[in-house]
């Protein structure tokens, strides 16, 4: 089922995993279950009955008490990723709405595939914009970086010259910021 509640203890475990990765807050959607629309069967802290006498409400309350006890010890903690994966919205739009060479190529799928590789090896990853400070990372991945805007190739070259490792894949560097093909060779 798509709208099932989390299993007992699952929300707590996921919340602590989030805190362990540097989160300073745990937020819930939705607080109160909707009475209409497509979200009326989504899980929520407060069910349709409107009472605090539910397993979910009790688990959220208990988690709140636990986090209150340890809050000062974990607030502001960080997990410094050594890998950055570039996600660029303009690249997404240009690639998603191009008519070729392959209409089935999906930017987000390629990003997710790259992310999953590192995730499955328990390697922390930051999703970073195209204009990020790459020097913070040992490795920067730019899957299907179809659109290479002015200054990006130079920025990535400088990163590699300084000792960084860049991974890119097919369909990278094909067009500039106006979605026109680079003439005279790709950067």
At which residue positions do the language-model features occur?
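Carbohydrate-binding surfaces of carbohydrate-active enzymes
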Residues: 1-187
């Amino acid at each position: 089922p798509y709208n099932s509640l989390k299993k007992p203890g699952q929300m707590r475990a996921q919340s602590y995993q989030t805190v362990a990765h540097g989160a300073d807050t745990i937020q819930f959607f939705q607080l109160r279950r909707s009475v209409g629309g497509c979200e009326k069967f989504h899980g929520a802290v407060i069910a349709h009955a409107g009472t605090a006498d539910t397993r979910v409400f009790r688990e959220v309350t208990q988690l709140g008490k636990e986090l209150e006890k340890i809050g000062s010890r974990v607030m502001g903690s960080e997990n410094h990723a050594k890998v950055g994966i570039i996600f660029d919205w303009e690249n997404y739009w240009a690639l998603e709405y191009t008519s070729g060479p392959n209409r089935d190529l999906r930017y987000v799928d390629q990003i997710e595939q790259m992310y999953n590789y590192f995730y499955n090896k328990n390697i922390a990853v930051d999703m970073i914009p195209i204009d990020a400070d790459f020097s913070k990372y040992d490795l920067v991945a730019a899957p299907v970086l179809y659109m290479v805007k002015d200054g990006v190739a130079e920025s990535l070259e400088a990163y590699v010259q300084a000792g960084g490792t860049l991974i890119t894949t097919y369909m990278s560097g094909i067009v500039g910021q106006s979605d026109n093909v680079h003439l005279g060779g790709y950067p």
